[in-house]
C-alpha cells in the first residue's frame, strides 16, 4: 500500500513472456508435407545421426521412421523444426523467410553498403557447409613461431564460426520476421539474430548459467546429430578457442532484449599468450587440459582485470599447476 507503481520496461516484459513461450520448433507447420522436405538434407541428417549414435543401422531406416524417432513429424504433421532443418529451399522462402541467413561482406568497417551479399535459404543440413565455405573463401591466417612452436592461427576459426552460427539458428526467435545476419570484414565478423538471450542468460553469466533453448526440439535434433552441444558447451568452445588464440574475448555487449549480437575479432592481441596456452596444453594430459574457465581467468590476469569471487577456485587450480603465482 502506498508504493508507487512503475512502468514495466520492455526488457522485463520480454523476459516474462520468454519464460513461458511455447517451443516454436515443436509446433506443426500446417502447409508442410513430407514432399516439402529435401532428400539431400534428409540423407545428411541420417548420416550424422548414425555417426553420432554410433549405429549404422539408422542409415537403413526409412525417412519417415527417422523423422518420427526424432519427433520431427507427429500424427498431426510436419514440425517447424523439420522445415528449418530439412525443408526445400523454395518452401522455406515461402513459409519462413526469416529462417534465411544473410552473409554480407565489406572490405572496411566504416563502409555502409556491402560489397557482396548472399542469402542462404537452404535447409540447415545443406546450408551450414555452404555458408562456412563462403566465409572461409575470404579467410586468412597468422603464423606464430617461437622456438619449437610453429603453428598457424586462422583469422576466423572454423569451430568458432560454426558454433556461433549454430547458436544463432538454435536460439533465435522465429516469430520475428528478420533474418540472421552475418557481417564479415577482413578482420572482424558479426553475427546478429532476432530475439534476446534465452531466459535467465545475461552477458555476465553466459558461461556459467545453464539455459533452456528457445527452440528445444531444434536443439535436441542438432544435439542428437552431433551438430551442437546440448549442455551449452557451444559457448564454451567459442570462448575457449578465441582466447586460446590470443584474440579479444567474444563480445556480446551489443545484445539487448530484441537481438543477440556476437562480435568476433580476427586480430591476435597477444602472440605470447597464444604460445603460452599452446605450450601448456601440449604438456598436460588429455584429461587434464585447461578448461574454458581457467583460460578465461588467465586472460583476465593477462589484461590486469579484477578477478571475481567465482574465480577463486580456478585461481587455486592454476596455482597448483604452477601457472600463476599470487
What feature does the model see in each segment?
Residues 1-278, 282-292, 296-324:
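Conserved N-terminal catalytic/coupling substructures associated with nucleotide/phosphate chemistry
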